[in-house]
């Protein structure tokens, strides 16, 4: 997975055939569409959802949106929108919980790629960025 400003999500499940995982790359459009929850629901077929992790991405401090987009997020994920920003981490958490991931088993990195200079950020650096690499390995 090569997320830019998008939200990287890893979902883990277990079942009779052994453990399985999914990686999800969710931009704001995918987040509103419920891509994290849809992936979790698909992974849960015949399995039990065990955990999920939300990796570094643009944080609620920096994801400024216009009023129309703020309203769309608030309608889809109550409590996710501030006066001028949206908390995509909260959106991911709510989507995963709704799909059946136990709330206590969802880990959010809490690292904002826009405000933390150790990460690339399209918004912060006006498009002059690289990519982050994320991968999962089943052992």
Language-model region placement:
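Active-site microenvironment for binding and transforming phosphate-containing groups
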Residues: 1-139
